[in-house]
Amino acid sequence: LHALIRDFGLPVGVLDRLIAALRWDIHREPHADAQGLAAYLEDTGAGLMWLAARALGAPDGAENAVRAYGWATATAGYLRAVPELRAKGRHPLPAGLSAQDLAQQGLAKLAQARSARRSVPRGVRPALLAGWQTKIFLDQVL
Protein backbone atom coordinates (compact mmCIF):
# COMPACT_ATOMS: atom_id res chain seq x y z
CA LEU A 1 0.00 0.00 0.00
CA HIS A 2 2.83 2.36 0.83
CA ALA A 3 4.38 1.80 -2.60
CA LEU A 4 1.04 2.44 -4.30
CA ILE A 5 0.55 5.69 -2.40
CA ARG A 6 4.12 6.78 -3.12
CA ASP A 7 4.28 5.71 -6.76
CA PHE A 8 0.95 7.24 -7.76
CA GLY A 9 0.94 10.19 -5.39
CA LEU A 10 -2.37 9.12 -3.89
CA PRO A 11 -3.88 11.54 -1.36
CA VAL A 12 -3.36 9.98 2.06
CA GLY A 13 -6.15 12.04 3.61
CA VAL A 14 -8.69 10.36 1.34
CA LEU A 15 -7.45 6.95 2.47
CA ASP A 16 -7.54 8.01 6.14
CA ARG A 17 -11.17 9.16 5.81
CA LEU A 18 -12.06 5.91 4.04
CA ILE A 19 -10.63 3.83 6.87
CA ALA A 20 -12.31 5.95 9.53
CA ALA A 21 -15.68 5.75 7.76
CA LEU A 22 -15.48 1.98 7.44
CA ARG A 23 -15.52 1.71 11.22
CA TRP A 24 -19.28 2.20 10.93
CA ASP A 25 -19.44 -1.20 9.27
CA ILE A 26 -18.32 -2.95 12.45
CA HIS A 27 -20.43 -0.98 14.93
CA ARG A 28 -24.14 -1.28 15.55
CA GLU A 29 -25.01 2.40 15.93
CA PRO A 30 -27.03 3.91 13.10
CA HIS A 31 -25.85 6.95 11.18
CA ALA A 32 -26.85 9.97 13.26
CA ASP A 33 -28.70 11.64 10.39
CA ALA A 34 -28.88 11.96 6.62
CA GLN A 35 -25.73 14.10 6.61
CA GLY A 36 -23.87 11.38 8.48
CA LEU A 37 -24.88 8.79 5.90
CA ALA A 38 -23.95 11.18 3.07
CA ALA A 39 -20.52 11.67 4.65
CA TYR A 40 -20.12 7.88 4.91
CA LEU A 41 -20.93 7.47 1.20
CA GLU A 42 -18.56 10.32 0.32
CA ASP A 43 -15.70 8.95 2.40
CA THR A 44 -16.15 5.35 1.26
CA GLY A 45 -17.51 5.02 -2.27
CA ALA A 46 -16.60 8.45 -3.62
CA GLY A 47 -13.19 8.42 -1.95
CA LEU A 48 -12.32 4.91 -3.07
CA MET A 49 -13.32 5.60 -6.67
CA TRP A 50 -11.23 8.79 -6.62
CA LEU A 51 -8.21 6.85 -5.34
CA ALA A 52 -8.63 4.31 -8.16
CA ALA A 53 -8.95 7.09 -10.71
CA ARG A 54 -5.85 8.86 -9.38
CA ALA A 55 -3.90 5.61 -9.61
CA LEU A 56 -4.87 5.54 -13.30
CA GLY A 57 -3.69 9.11 -13.80
CA ALA A 58 -6.84 11.17 -13.30
CA PRO A 59 -6.18 14.91 -13.32
CA ASP A 60 -7.49 17.13 -10.53
CA GLY A 61 -10.17 18.40 -12.92
CA ALA A 62 -11.82 14.96 -12.96
CA GLU A 63 -12.31 14.77 -9.21
CA ASN A 64 -15.87 16.14 -9.03
CA ALA A 65 -17.15 13.83 -11.77
CA VAL A 66 -15.40 10.77 -10.36
CA ARG A 67 -16.52 11.45 -6.80
CA ALA A 68 -20.13 12.04 -7.87
CA TYR A 69 -20.08 8.76 -9.77
CA GLY A 70 -18.51 7.01 -6.79
CA TRP A 71 -21.14 8.44 -4.45
CA ALA A 72 -23.95 7.24 -6.71
CA THR A 73 -22.34 3.81 -7.03
CA ALA A 74 -21.86 3.55 -3.26
CA THR A 75 -25.49 4.55 -2.77
CA ALA A 76 -26.67 1.75 -5.05
CA GLY A 77 -24.52 -0.78 -3.19
CA TYR A 78 -25.63 0.53 0.18
CA LEU A 79 -29.30 0.27 -0.77
CA ARG A 80 -28.74 -3.29 -1.95
CA ALA A 81 -27.35 -4.09 1.51
CA VAL A 82 -30.25 -2.52 3.45
CA PRO A 83 -32.36 -5.70 3.71
CA GLU A 84 -29.45 -7.74 5.05
CA LEU A 85 -28.42 -4.99 7.46
CA ARG A 86 -31.99 -4.84 8.78
CA ALA A 87 -32.09 -8.63 9.11
CA LYS A 88 -29.01 -8.34 11.33
CA GLY A 89 -30.72 -5.80 13.57
CA ARG A 90 -29.00 -2.75 12.11
CA HIS A 91 -30.67 0.55 11.26
CA PRO A 92 -29.01 1.53 7.97
CA LEU A 93 -31.27 4.46 7.11
CA PRO A 94 -31.45 7.42 9.47
CA ALA A 95 -34.85 8.53 10.72
CA GLY A 96 -36.66 10.57 8.10
CA LEU A 97 -34.68 9.22 5.14
CA SER A 98 -36.35 6.59 2.98
CA ALA A 99 -34.66 4.28 0.52
CA GLN A 100 -36.45 6.18 -2.24
CA ASP A 101 -35.07 9.51 -0.98
CA LEU A 102 -31.55 8.08 -0.96
CA ALA A 103 -32.02 6.60 -4.44
CA GLN A 104 -33.12 10.04 -5.70
CA GLN A 105 -29.96 11.57 -4.23
CA GLY A 106 -27.91 8.87 -5.92
CA LEU A 107 -29.55 9.58 -9.27
CA ALA A 108 -28.84 13.30 -8.84
CA LYS A 109 -25.16 12.53 -8.22
CA LEU A 110 -25.15 10.22 -11.23
CA ALA A 111 -26.57 13.01 -13.40
CA GLN A 112 -23.90 15.37 -12.04
CA ALA A 113 -21.19 12.85 -12.93
CA ARG A 114 -22.56 12.27 -16.40
CA SER A 115 -22.73 15.99 -17.14
CA ALA A 116 -19.02 16.27 -16.30
CA ARG A 117 -17.87 13.01 -17.89
CA ARG A 118 -15.71 14.82 -20.44
CA SER A 119 -13.39 15.77 -17.58
CA VAL A 120 -12.54 12.08 -17.10
CA PRO A 121 -9.86 10.90 -19.57
CA ARG A 122 -10.48 7.65 -21.41
CA GLY A 123 -7.56 5.93 -19.66
CA VAL A 124 -9.15 6.61 -16.27
CA ARG A 125 -12.57 5.18 -17.11
CA PRO A 126 -11.73 1.63 -15.95
CA ALA A 127 -11.83 3.04 -12.40
CA LEU A 128 -15.54 3.68 -12.96
CA LEU A 129 -16.49 0.20 -14.15
CA ALA A 130 -17.74 -0.82 -10.72
CA GLY A 131 -20.70 1.48 -11.28
CA TRP A 132 -21.95 0.12 -14.57
CA GLN A 133 -25.29 -0.99 -13.06
CA THR A 134 -25.79 1.97 -10.74
CA LYS A 135 -28.66 3.62 -12.61
CA ILE A 136 -30.49 0.34 -13.12
CA PHE A 137 -30.47 -0.42 -9.40
CA LEU A 138 -31.31 3.11 -8.25
CA ASP A 139 -34.25 3.17 -10.68
CA GLN A 140 -35.48 -0.14 -9.23
CA VAL A 141 -35.60 1.36 -5.74
CA LEU A 142 -37.96 4.04 -6.97
Placement of each model-derived feature along the sequence:
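Hydrophobic pocket-lining residues within nucleotide cofactor-binding pockets
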Residues: 53
